[in-house]
Swiss-Prot record:
Mn(2+) 1 binds at D13, D339, H340. SUPFAM superfamilies: Alkaline phosphatase-like, DeoB insert domain-like. This is Phosphopentomutase. Pfam families: Metalloenzyme. The gene is deoB. One of its GO terms (cellular component) is cytosol. Pathway: Carbohydrate degradation; 2-deoxy-D-ribose 1-phosphate degradation; D-glyceraldehyde 3-phosphate and acetaldehyde from 2-deoxy-alpha-D-ribose 1-phosphate: step 1/2. Belongs to the phosphopentomutase family. Isomerase that catalyzes the conversion of deoxy-ribose 1-phosphate (dRib-1-P) and ribose 1-phosphate (Rib-1-P) to deoxy-ribose 5-phosphate (dRib-5-P) and ribose 5-phosphate (Rib-5-P), respectively. CDD domains: PPM (cd16009).
Length: 403
């Protein structure tokens, strides 16, 4: 019998808690990540008021300098620690795959200066359409169509852009480039980005509609991912007949592998919390695991180096936390963590190599406090231990510490 009948894992995308020991091996605009500290710098520069996460023990997590505006609790209601990444990467897929038990020794490729001419030329030859070279760089998905949508409507050229993650995105106005044609072009792009020098995690079709100054992305988005290179704990749970719920982009990150209930994409963090609560309160979800990603911290504020917006986004989540806890059953376990850092006060616009926080709470807890500093994959090992399935490649369970 499982110690916890249901386990719920929430990834606060990019909410790091201080530079990892190997952070200087990773850079942002030529600056090593060694001084990065997402939560620490937000707390120090613009203040951070997250009383509900503080109650769980966020301010108790060991650091050289305590979080300036997040107090330590003398009697927290949960367990807390920080976790270190062993994989060679600081992107979304690497972080999530390691959380589910994989060690990524070959990082995906990212393209801060845009995709090489060879890739663009192959796509042009296949599609019969030119590529707008000026868009070929890391770009906000809404800004890129605002900037180049009018030109695409006139010329029929492709808008190809990337981000901090290993992705190639193609935006196309549905009246100019039909959705099915866009999908075919993306499938070709997927076929030429499966190995170095362009090993990409996802190809994303980004259809949109509207007129210049009023473009809107549609629900016809399609993600062409690659599956994890080895079974994750999600696969182990699924094979054992245990329910696995995905909220947000989790299913995309794992290419649907190991997911048997997908709650769909989130329109916002708040929408993601709504979807999580919908899953938690479903009569069908009696036993199993839910896995949620809330991406607004990263996508809207981390990459854009907006500490005030990032802080407000954290406040917004913290205000919803009591609702999540209220949806828990007595023998549920809630876990809150991250997948990498993205310090909004740091150089550049890329992710930062950081420890991630880990908070755990159950109404059944008799004790609370700190658990030893571990690694990302310890989360999946703990989940596997709880449900009596085999763990994946790496990770050590701390299930016995949660009492």
């Amino acid at each position: 019998m499982s110690k916890f009948n249901r386990m719920h894992l929430i990834v606060l995308d990019s909410v790091g808690i201080g530079a990892a020991p190997d952070a200087n091996n990773f850079v942002n605009a030529g600056v090593p990540d060694g001084a990065s500290d997402t939560l620490g710098h937000i707390s120090k520069t613009v203040g951070l008021n997250v009383p509900n996460m503080a109650k769980l023990g966020l301010g108790n997590i060991p650091r050289e300098q305590p979080l300036k505006t997040v107090p330590a609790e003398s009697n927290p209601t949960g367990y807390a620690t920080k976790l270190e990444e062993v994989s060679l990467g600081k992107d979304t897929m690497t972080g999530h795959w390691e959380i589910m038990g994989l060690n990524i020794t070959e990082p995906f490729d990212t393209f801060w200066n845009g995709f090489p001419e060879e890739i663009l030329t192959q796509i042009e030859e296949f599609s019969g359409r030119k590529v707008i070279r000026e868009a070929n760089k890391p770009y906000s998905g809404t800004a890129v169509i605002d900037d180049f949508g009018p030109r695409q409507m006139e010329t029929g050229e492709l808008i190809i852009y990337t981000s901090a993650d290993p992705v190639l995105q193609i935006a196309a106005h549905e009246d100019i480039i039909p959705v099915e044609e866009l999908y075919r072009i993306c499938e070709f792009a997927r076929s030429i980005t499966l190995e170095r020098p362009a090993l990409l995690g996802r190809i994303i079709a980004r259809p949109y509609v509207g007129e210049p100054g009023n473009f809107t992305r549609t629900s016809n988005r399609r993600d062409l991912a690659i599956s994890p290179f080895a079974p994750t704990v999600l696969d182990k749970l699924n094979e054992a007949g245990i329910d696995t719920y995905s909220v947000g982009k989790i299913s995309d990150i794992f290419n649907g592998e190991g997911i048997n209930h997908d709650m769909g994409h989130n329109k916002s963090n708040n929408h993601g919390v709504d979807n999580l609560i919908k899953a938690m309160t479903s009569e069908d979800f009696k036993h199993g695991f839910s896995f949620t990603n809330l991406v607004d911290f990263d996508a809207l504020y981390g990459h854009r180096r907006n500490p005030q917006g990032y802080r407000d986004c954290l406040h917004e989540f913290d205000e919803r936390l009591p609702e999540i806890i209220a949806a828990m059953k007595e023998d549920d376990l809630l876990m809150i963590t991250a997948d990498h850092g993205n310090d909004p006060t740091y150089a550049g616009t890329d992710h930062t190599r950081e420890y991630i926080p880990f908070l755990a709470y159950s109404p059944s807890f008799k004790c609370s406090g700190l658990i030893p500093v571990g690694h990302f994959a310890d989360i999946s090992a703990t989940i596997a231990d709880n449900f009596g399935v085999e763990k994946a490649m790496i990770g050590e369970s701390f299930l016995d510490k949660l009492v």
